[in-house]
Amino acid sequence: MQIRVRLTAGLAELFRAPFLTIDLADGATVADLYARLAETEPDAAPALRSALAVVAGGHAGRDDLLRHRQEVALLLPISGG
């Protein structure tokens, strides 16, 4: 199945694109998506560990199942003072 990934801030810079289309096996989870992204761009692995997945406007846990052609936005935490 294909998943459309919307990358924000530093992740878009690491992957050199604001959007990616990732092929995953049927029954894949958000954790599987993170793993595939880390394989694709190993330098992004540390940022992916803290990224929040958003699907259909709500938080998606790492064990949540993904569906074909679903869009997943990956948000990095904001820090500062």
Feature-to-residue mapping (PLM):
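Ubiquitin-like/PB1-type beta-grasp interaction modules and other compact soluble beta-rich domains
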Residues: 1-80
